[in-house]
């Protein structure tokens, strides 16, 4: 069992990583006997895990209600958020309830925002079931829903009480979702840890076949890196912005193509190559390093070019609505070397468009 603590004073919380955690009531601490829980999951995951998690919580004396949400990024919306509020109010659940997010990034982000908002804030626990949510979205307290004009535009910083990562969930993950998660894994190596990127080059095949020790190390290292950044910059005023490598481009793809048509990790993968090409054009990143990124993403089964039907010009309106924009200027996360990156303002739109075009015609 791996255990990492995100140290944020009185809001500190553990990340527990192991197989078989759904069999142990102690995995869901700080829940105690007699407490109320609203378990939030999705239509795909409910048949797989709802009864199991409900059973282990009830075994611990916890009173469990549940709400099942439709699947897909397109449902990370205010309308679906309202169904969670309605379920909470119909019981009714008070401020002493705990929301448990059993699912991937959509369920986790939406449930976290529900917890931040309901009666001005109730406790919640993240139980991520996809690789992407295990290594990234469940850690750090970013919660949100989408708006038709932009991804994650309505949300809050709100930390969970704990994160429970059961590695067994990955056994039911479709290959495309596994690849999507690997995009975020590879991101950590590019922006923060060159040695981890080297390890990924050597061990990607083991991750693709869900080798237990390799996957446990991979998830632990990603969570360690994410925790270090969150502790240093919880509300993304500086360092934490680096975690958005590829996201400014990727969010534009998701919004333009329609949420759910490109998985988040797929869009981020293409966006990371666009960021690398931008950095190349600025003379601060080598084509050889870009090729290492492209090779690793391709081996993981991820796209390295943007959608053919989306012109370079179509990116700009979305990028100008990005949450990192300051004084009307796009801020980009750009690699300087494998394992080192920066937040860069003032890059000309022409250069950015040319970098996007590099990835459209490649």
Curated annotation (Swiss-Prot):
GO terms for biological process: amino acid biosynthetic process; aromatic amino acid family biosynthetic process; chorismate biosynthetic process. The gene is aroB. GO terms for molecular function: 3-dehydroquinate synthase activity; metal ion binding; nucleotide binding. This is 3-dehydroquinate synthase. SUPFAM superfamilies: Dehydroquinate synthase-like. Pathway: Metabolic intermediate biosynthesis; chorismate biosynthesis; chorismate from D-erythrose 4-phosphate and phosphoenolpyruvate: step 2/7. NAD(+) binds at residues 71-76, 105-109, 129-130, 142, 151, 169-172. Zn(2+) binds at residues 184, 247, 264. Belongs to the sugar phosphate cyclases superfamily. Dehydroquinate synthase family. It holds the Pfam family DHQS_C. Binds 1 divalent metal cation per subunit. Can use either Co(2+) or Zn(2+). Keywords: Amino-acid biosynthesis, Aromatic amino acid biosynthesis, Cobalt, Cytoplasm, Lyase, Metal-binding, NAD, Nucleotide-binding, Zinc.
């Amino acid at each position: 069992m791996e255990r990492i603590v995100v140290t944020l004073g009185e809001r500190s919380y553990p990340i527990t990583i192991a197989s078989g955690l759904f069999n142990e009531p102690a995995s869901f601490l700080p829940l105690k006997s007699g407490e109320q829980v609203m378990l939030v999951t999705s239509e795909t995951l409910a048949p797989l895990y709802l009864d199991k998690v409900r059973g282990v919580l009830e075994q611990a004396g916890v009173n469990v209600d549940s709400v099942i949400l439709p699947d897909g990024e397109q449902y990370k919306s205010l309308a679906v958020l309202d169904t969670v509020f309605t379920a909470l109010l119909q019981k009714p659940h008070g401020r002493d309830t705990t929301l448990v997010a059993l699912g991937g990034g959509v369920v986790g982000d939406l449930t976290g925002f529900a917890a931040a908002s309901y009666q001005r804030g109730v406790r919640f626990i993240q139980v991520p079931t996809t690789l992407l949510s295990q290594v990234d979205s469940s850690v750090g307290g970013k919660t949100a829903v989408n708006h038709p004009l932009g991804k994650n535009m309505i949300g809050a910083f709100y930390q969970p009480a704990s994160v429970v990562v059961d590695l067994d969930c990955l056994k039911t993950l479709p290959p495309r979702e596994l690849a999507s998660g690997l995009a975020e894994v590879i991101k950590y190596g590019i922006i923060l840890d060159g040695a981890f990127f080297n390890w990924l080059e050597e061990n990607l095949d083991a991750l693709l076949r869900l080798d237990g020790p390799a996957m446990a190390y991979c998830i632990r290292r990603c969570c360690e890196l994410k925790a270090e950044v969150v502790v240093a910059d919880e509300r993304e005023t500086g360092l934490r912005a680096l975690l958005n490598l590829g996201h400014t481009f990727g969010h534009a793809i998701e919004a333009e193509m329609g949420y759910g048509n490109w998985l988040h990790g797929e869009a981020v993968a293409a966006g990371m190559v666009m960021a690398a090409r931008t950095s190349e054009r600025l003379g601060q990143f080598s084509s050889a390093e870009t090729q290492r990124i492209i090779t690793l993403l391709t081996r993981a089964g991820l796209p390295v070019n943007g959608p053919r039907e989306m012109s370079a010009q179509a990116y700009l309106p979305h990028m100008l609505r990005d949450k990192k924009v300051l004084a009307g200027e796009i801020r980009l996360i750009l690699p300087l070397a494998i394992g080192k990156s920066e937040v860069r303002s003032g890059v000309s739109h022409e250069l950015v468009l040319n970098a996007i075009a590099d990835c459209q015609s490649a």
